[in-house]
Amino acid sequence: MPMETVRQTCRPKHQILVLKCYPQYQKGVQEVKPNSSELSYLLYYVSTRRSKLPKVSAFLEKRAARDVWRRKIGNVQVTLQILSALIEKVPRDLPIFARSVLTIIETVLRSRDISMVEDSIATFETFCRHQDMAALSAEQDFANQYRDVIQIYAGFAHEEQQHPSKISSLPQTIRWKNAGLRAIKGAVSSEAGLAADGGDLLRIILPVIMENLYNGEDSFIESLEHKLHEAERNVPDPASRRRYSAVTVQTVDTAEGDPALAAQNIADVDRKAELDMRLLALRCLDQVIVNGSSRGQIRLTTRLVLDFILRKGQSNNTYLSLDTDENNWATSLIEVVAKWCPVQARFIISSAAMEVLFEIPPKEDTLDEAFTVIYIIDYLLKSSVNMIGLSVIDVLLGLMRYMAMLVSPASAKGTDEQPDSSEKPGYDDGTNLSQKKKDLLVLLQKCIGDLTTHIYYGDQVVDMLRAILTRIKPPHGQDQVSAVIPEQLDGHLSEANPTSFFSTSAKVCALRAIKNILLVANSQRPMTSAGVESRNPVGIHVWEGTHWLLQDPQKEVRYAYVDALLYWLKLETNKNDLKLKDRSTTTALISARRDFSNTSERAAKRATGTHHREKALVVAQSNFLRLLHLTIYDVALQSSTQEKEIRILHLLLASLVENLGINAARFGLPMILKLQDDMTTLENSNTQAAKVNIGSLVHGYLWVLSETFGLDTHRAGQEIYTEIEKRKSRSIWLDSIGFSLESFESIIKDDRHALSHNTRETDKMTLFKDGVEEFVRRIEESYNRTVPAHDPPTSPGRNLGKPVIGGYLPPANQQLSDLLPPVVREQMLSPWSKQSALEAAEREKAEALSLNGSRTGTLPVRGHAHANGTGSSISTNSPSTAHVATAGLQTSRRMSMPDKTVTPNHNSSRDSPVRVNELRRVLSVQAPDRDRRLSPLRGRLDASNGSIISSSSESMVSGFSNSEFEGDGGSILLPTRDGQEPLDGDGMETPRPLSNGNNYGYLQTAFRASSSSIPPVPPIPHGISIPGGFPNDSQRSLPTPDRPSTASSRKQSLINGKFGIAAPADDKTLHRQKSRTGVGLVNGAEVPEVAINGKSTGTHSYGLQEVEETSQRRDVQKLLEGVLSSSEPASTLQPRVASNYSGRRSVTGGIGRPPY
């Protein structure tokens, strides 16, 4: 054949090398492989000559097209294997011949030959494993070609897209599906492949995967998942396989296979093949979720899954309903997706589901789809899948918004139509809602409640209830229900807020959702669904501003509100709620559990802010209870003839007392007594029946108080019980109000008519008036006796690693903070009126707003400190006097930046320890009028000998401030004298450590007593120049030559019932001229010339007499003289013997003289 020889001679070398790889035709061989040696040389050839790669791939492309046309399956197999070898040999050069690879694969796929299609899968998997995603994203034509190939493979796996002529039997169908799913698995196994095309690939393959997973059985997905995990566990380890000898011949017995399957019939084999095919589809879904773990891909995957579920439900007419089993096919599929999804991205599934929900209009013909989506969301929320990062409030508001849209009149007419302006949506009773809408509303309420299955942060339940309650609005045109309009009654804000609830149905649904939240949050759940952290209890402040719902025109709203409130009282209150929560006790309660350690400025500010927040919560609680009892008063008078309403009010009042104790009784008792007085002035057509109902409500409440506080054995309790029995015997008592409370459900379901009473006997009812004072006194005694049992006294809060002041509190002081304040007793005895209650509510509301809005609070600054909650009477001293009386414990809150309006700062002893933040403060403050005040605790309370040895050692009270006692954050700035610093020396020297923990109980009074013996500090000598100041350009007090500034003073002791300095053996007692610095101040020790007010005064005595006085200073001196003269006569005072500790302070601490 000379022409063939010439043709072979003229061929390029790369074609010759390719052709040599094809073996000779062998008849009967199922799998043809390329010649190994020729293939190896071809791979070496192209790897060393990159320019030959396009030529080799182009030649393979032509060769494959001819072989496919001629149905030469063996040559096609060799071509595909050559391509796989080329990709693995030069993976970096794949973009050079990637288009040819896809062209060859596409040519093979369009042949519709199952054998060639199956042979192409290995090459396609190799291509997907090594492809360059940058090229796939950059070249649009290449990306379209890649997508077309995957579309063809997906069509093989989709039964509807298979060619009719190729579908002959079930085994053949399963074979085509397996081929398509294997190719899909290869495509999704590459993480970059899913992220390259913006989600187009997911839109192609996910519906095919889910189509092969669906068979209509509810538990099918769960069983598939179990088999998948079992198969993964049983996969043998290739490294541990036995190595066979070269001469060993495998027999039929050693071949792999399933003997049990071999013994079955053809139908069982087909079922096994179909199950394997569905397992392959589940593995594809696993790869999609694991590799497509970006947030955008998870969002798209969720939407595609939900769209498939909705489409299947529409085609099969099998939507989910309230009667559907929770473990159905749709919920199992979405749970598998959520479990396989990365933990940090699971919350996106719920967000995507909410987006799908809002794309479904709330119309009658689309309610089934909305129900399915909400059902799946609810299943996810209550499942064991923990979605960390879920925005609970966003999901809650979304569900509430859809609920509001569902009950609005526009939803019944369509979204494009506008509701009639003449309609009053606030007064619908829900009877016009279809059954589908009612079922959907029930599901929405259940879904909102299931949001609390997992607790993701402490205040989650509190925030959820607050978000719902603040969006419940009164209907348009409704008159205000009380003189106090809550903040949420703003009509313009309500119209702009789509989640506002105006209609009756919306309010009822929201209140029932609150009930579900409380039930789920308090239910006992298994550990698998437990939250990541414990939650905080829901306080009564959450209900502030909702009292008007008790007066709503629609009874459904009133009943739902009372039901939710009763569940809150039952589930969220404990014994601690029986203890009084009042502003007068807030300071003591906060101080009792605070550690007095050396805290930083940030910690002090945080403690102050927490104190203000707790005060605001207490104000909100009392405000709500006051207005709630006011509303109960109005409802009782308006519905005095309706027995059901009176029974509900009695149940509510009794539950408040039983669960809140004195906190509810302080507002309920005056209101009930006022209601008793108004009973005689009722002007109704059924006045006598109203008197019976009101009288039963009043004495029923009094009996509840009597039983709650254990007063049934006292005279007042016996009087109440006797009156109740007398009224029962005369038939002037409401029988439903008994000694045991009814359930709310029984009251609502009771449809019996009102019983007739002996109205002629109403004049013989005895009012409870004479025993009120004794009744209140017994309540006070019972509270004072029982509260310590609920709240046993504990030791002061300790923090390991930080010094603790004291370790003991006198029992008397501990009990004083637990006693019922006199203001509460007076409140229960004072006459009650609506106007006074409204004024008190407005006043407390304004105070709460000022506490929340002010940075430092608005409470007045007191001239005393509370030590661990022992408390003391409110000081009436002036700011300057109170400042002197606290002896270094300033009540100013330390600010992070200097104030422009403050006066020059206090001084600090030169030798006291200086901290880094004080040095930073010196460098940051330039102007003298912007100096930052030093910590009030740097001042010396009283020095000790131990502090002389090492002045840099910290005192145990060096972090101690009045801001931690009071928390009001006020700031007292001392007056200056012609630009000079104040001369009281407050906070100038190092405090001494506490000598004995037993004296800590007297800390507050001891501070005030010791402050009276501290003389003012004189100005520094004129000759000393301090550039820049130290710190803050402040003056320093110099130690006297006779006694160092850190020498110890006398211990404090109790003298004649008052605190003072312990007298020595020769009866030397405290005098106002005696100071901590020794006799030098008393005898007028001479000091160098100093300048006062810019004038040189020369050498003078260093004592009180030589200091220039002002009117304010004279007032302070008079106060001190009055305090000292009342404790000890001046004639007993003798000067202290001079000490020989001169100069020791100069070498024991500090950082030396400035400048630095």
Swiss-Prot record:
Q: Indicate, by first and last residue, each region the UniProt record lists as having compositional bias (Low complexity).
A: 944-964, 1022-1031
Source organism, top-level taxon: Eukaryota
* Signal peptide positions (record): none
Q: Which GO terms describe its cellular component?
A: plasma membrane
Compositionally skewed regions (Basic and acidic residues) per UniProt: 908-921
GO biological process annotation, one example = protein localization to plasma membrane
Where is region (Disordered) located? Answer: 412-431, 786-805, 840-990, 1020-1057, 1125-1156
What InterPro entries does UniProt report for this protein, alphabetically?
ARM-type_fold, EFR3, EFR3_HEAT-like_rpt
Polar residues bias: start-end ranges: 869-894, 1032-1055, 1125-1145
Instruction: Name the family the entry cites.
Output: Belongs to the EFR3 family.
Q: What is this protein called?
A: Protein efr3
Q: Which organism is it from?
A: Emericella nidulans (strain FGSC A4 / ATCC 38163 / CBS 112.46 / NRRL 194 / M139)
